[in-house]
A protein has these predicted regions:
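Acyltransferase donor/substrate-recognition loop-hinge adjacent to the catalytic core
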Residues: 150-228
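C-terminal "cap" of GNAT-fold acetyltransferases
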Residues: 175-190, 369-408
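Flexible loop/turn segments at secondary-structure boundaries
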Residues: 67, 77-80, 129-131, 181, ...
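Active-site proximal loops enriched in glycine and acidic residues that flank catalytic Cys/His/Asp
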Residues: 258-259, 267-273, 307-313, 328, ...
């Protein structure tokens, strides 16, 4: 076996195409979009490079010259020094079922990160936001993957754990049948808050992107801005997020709650893009874009992908959550475009959101695990802190808020 750094078009093509071998017999597999992967490693498109971020990629070739594995290692300037110990990252890991091959790939990451001066690595994660390429699938390997979520063979888990990685936190993915009415507990609370004539719930059809961004910013900063390890969002970030959704946005499923003119909650979803991307074979070249736009325009969609759900602090637990769920059932479902929803990225460190999800009548659909490995075994390991439980010592290596935009 030979490990080669990605340095040109040939090795980049091998980095992208290695999945063809690994998932050749997996009927559920839908590849990530090539262009989504490539922009992560493009200094012109990934702002982390301008902030001093560093990255390296490798492809592992077998005895016959075929690509049999890949991996990337990186130092994110926003998160590397978030805690007491500098931590880098590794991700985009793919490998045949061969432990020696897996060790070669992980060793490459470790050695490179040690040279960069960090003491540990999280993985598999993204060199960017948490909404894509984050976590290792460790529960429920049946069914097609959702857009942006990692999908992998079951044997990857043994590679990570045998190498010494430990579970830092889990990302939970839930499924809900939209035909099921909102649970009684939500209806009762929703009715109470709805009795206030100032309260309303609305979709965003006809609302400008600039206004949606300002609503999003206000609720996000109120809901998460004060949590340990979270920073307030800037308006430029909010605008960028909404702009990135432009082509795929369905304003009817961008749901906001208001008290008067003040936004106090949101339940934001997009169409499940993999219902369309399954037809483009992982490539949005000109032909892939044509097929995607055709599917987007004419294919009947079934699933919406919940990307973020939040309520301003002062209104949490007062029925706003239920009112937005009730609105979805009474207004969105009768439109006939969606039958079910996938609620992604609920961290197991977020008990408040887990309680809300538990009362929604959802089913746990998948679990993805973010692992952490300290290179020095004498460094004490701690799981991700639970939101709302502020530690006496500020020694946990939290991820920066800017890495969890669009997630719960």
């Amino acid at each position: 076996m030979k490990l080669v750094q990605v340095s040109d078009k040939k090795t980049n093509d091998a980095f992208i195409s290695v999945t063809r071998l690994i998932y050749a017999q997996d009927k559920n597999y839908i590849p990530h979009i090539r262009q989504d992967i490539e922009k992560v490693f493009d200094p012109k498109k990934n702002k982390l490079f301008k902030l001093g971020g560093k990255c390296e990629r490798w492809v592992l070739f077998g005895e016959k010259g075929e690509a049999i594995g890949r991996v990337a290692a990186f130092v994110n300037p926003k998160t590397v020094n978030a805690g007491m110990h500098p931590v880098g990252g590794m991700g985009f890991f793919e490998c045949i079922d061969n432990s020696d091959a897996a060790i070669m790939l992980m060793n490459a990451c470790k050695e490179w990160l040690v040279n960069e001066g960090v003491l540990g690595m999280d993985g598999p994660i993204n060199f960017g936001e948490r909404d894509q390429f984050w976590g290792l699938l460790t529960e429920n390997f049946t069914g097609k993957p959702s857009y942006g979520l990692n999908y992998n063979p079951p044997y990857y888990q043994k590679f990570f754990e045998q190498y010494g990685f430990r579970e830092y936190f889990k990302q939970l993915v839930f499924w809900r049948d939209l035909q099921i009415p909102a649970q009684e507990i939500f209806v009762k609370k929703a009715d109470i808050v709805s009795s206030n004539s100032e309260f309303s719930v609305k979709g965003m059809r006809g609302v400008s992107h600039a206004k949606i961004a300002s609503y999003f910013l206000e609720v996000y900063n109120s809901a998460w801005g004060g949590h340990e390890g979270f920073k307030s969002m800037r308006i430029e970030q909010a605008r960028s997020i909404i702009k990135s959704m432009n082509v795929i946005m369905d304003p009817d499923i961008l749901i906001f709650a208001f008290m008067g003119e003040k936004p106090i909650g949101f339940y934001l979803s997009i169409p499940e893009l993999n219902e369309f991307f399954v037809h483009v074979n992982g490539n949005l070249n000109w032909w892939g874009k044509l097929k995607f736009m055709y599917q987007l325009k004419f294919k009947k969609r079934h699933t919406m992908l919940g990307i973020v759900f939040g309520v301003s602090k002062e209104y949490q637990g007062k029925g706003v959550e239920g009112a937005m769920i009730k609105y979805c059932g009474e207004v969105v479902v009768p439109m006939g475009r969606y039958k079910d929803t996938i609620l992604t990225w609920i961290g197991d460190f977020n008990p408040r959101m887990l309680k809300v999800i538990g009362n929604l009548g959802t089913e746990l659909y998948r679990s993805l695990t973010t692992y952490r490995l300290y290179f020095d075994s004498s460094i004490p390991f701690e799981r991700h802190p639970v939101l709302g439980e502020r530690k006496a010592s500020q020694n946990s290596d939290n991820q920066n808020t800017e890495e969890v935009i669009g997630n719960n």
